[in-house]
């Protein structure tokens, strides 16, 4: 977000601007001269904005589906063996993400909420602030801060992203993490067992998607790039794309005309999206696919063994 020096509100969207301490990351009064937390002088401190409230959004885990409404409330359906669906008290949510069996959300004040399996500390987000987005891998969580830096927690997560800067989006796969850079390139960290981290040649990227065994980048021209490794048949031939999501074994994308294409494992019907229209974005679970339509309706197809596709009554705005 480009701001005039000393601006208190964004000229474009009206979001209130505050200051962030360059030493400890604390968010401060916009007129503060010293950090209230660590005492560092704040002359030249970078202005940051809170995450802008969205109309709504969706996320898909292994056996559960989550969405947030325009009023900041959260909807959830599916398996709750680890408490991943215990979101009843959540409010002011502006973003959600699902891991295998846990759920994470960003609140309007830039903090995070988490519930579900915490075996590897993937839900230990109590100290996270200044967030604008989150992403979940199978057993780790990644948070994007308003200054373009990235936080991570969970199995083998913290050392992966600590030096990243100028990041505008993040996504997480089974054992790797992707970051979209401001200049349209991408970075990756993690095991890269199947070549999932081979993104150094990517350019002109507008969105990223991390799966179990593959990584995809959506280019400005509406086509996809892949990292080395597994890729679903025909995906690189798709055109006119505006959004992409990947599950462990299937890939889903939205086209400019609001229709949806899918490829990969079809055993549970997760790729039966040919009749969908007016779709804005998609999410891919392990064996199911979810879509958010432009009118606020939510669609789902695939494995419904835990009720993860029971979204017919959902309306996000």
Give the positions of each predicted feature.
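Cys/His-rich metal-coordination motifs, chiefly Zn-binding "fingers/knuckles"
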Residues: 1-52
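Acidic/polar residues in short coil/turn loops that connect beta-strands
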Residues: 24, 71, 109, 147, ...
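Beta-strand-rich domains and repeat architectures in extracellular enzymes and scaffolds
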Residues: 51-68
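Residue-level recognition of a conserved intra-blade site in WD40 beta-propeller repeats
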Residues: 60, 68, 95-98, 106, ...
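Short glycine/serine- and acidic-residue-enriched loop/turn motifs that recur at repeat junctions
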Residues: 63-64, 68, 75-89, 101, ...
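Conserved core positions of repeat-based scaffolds
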Residues: 64-67, 76, 102-105, 114, ...
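Thr-biased low-complexity repeat/linker tracts and other Thr-enriched repetitive architectures
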Residues: 70-73, 91, 107-113, 129-133, ...
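Repeated scaffold domains used in trafficking and secretory/extracellular systems
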Residues: 93, 131-132, 167-168, 205-206, ...
């Amino acid at each position: 977000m480009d701001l005039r020096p000393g601006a208190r509100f964004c000229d474009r969207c009206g979001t209130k601007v505050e200051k962030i301490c360059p030493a400890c990351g604390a968010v401060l009064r916009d007129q503060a001269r010293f950090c209230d937390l660590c005492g560092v002088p704040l002359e030249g401190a970078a202005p940051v904005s809170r995450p802008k409230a969205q109309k709504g959004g969706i996320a898909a885990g292994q056996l559960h589906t989550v969405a947030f409404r325009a009023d900041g409330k959260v909807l959830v359906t599916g398996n709750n063996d680890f408490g991943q669906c215990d979101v009843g008290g959540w409010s002011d949510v502006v973003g959600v993400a699902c891991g295998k069996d846990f759920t994470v959300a960003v609140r309007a004040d830039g903090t995070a909420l988490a519930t579900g399996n915490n075996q590897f500390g993937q839900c230990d987000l109590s100290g996270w602030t200044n967030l604008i987005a989150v992403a979940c891998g199978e057993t780790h969580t990644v948070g994007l801060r308003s200054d373009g830096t990235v936080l991570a927690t969970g199995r083998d997560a913290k050392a992966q992203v600590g030096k990243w800067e100028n990041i505008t989006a993040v996504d997480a796969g089974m054992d790797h993490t992707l970051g979209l850079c401001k200049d349209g390139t991408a970075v990756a960290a993690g095991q890269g067992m199947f070549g999932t981290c081979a993104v150094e040649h990517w350019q002109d990227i507008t969105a990223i998607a991390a799966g179990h065994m593959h990584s995809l980048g959506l280019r400005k021209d509406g086509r996809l790039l892949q990292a080395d490794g597994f890729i679903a048949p025909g995906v690189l031939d798709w055109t006119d794309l505006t959004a992409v999501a990947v599950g462990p074994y299937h890939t889903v994308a939205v086209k400019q005309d609001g229709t949806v294409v899918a490829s990969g494992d079809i055993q549970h019907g997760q790729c039966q999206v040919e009749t969908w229209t007016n779709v804005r974005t998609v999410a891919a679970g392990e064996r199911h696919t979810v879509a958010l339509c432009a009118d606020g309706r939510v669609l789902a197809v695939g494995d419904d063994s835990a009720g993860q596709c029971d979204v017919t009554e959902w309306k996000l705005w």
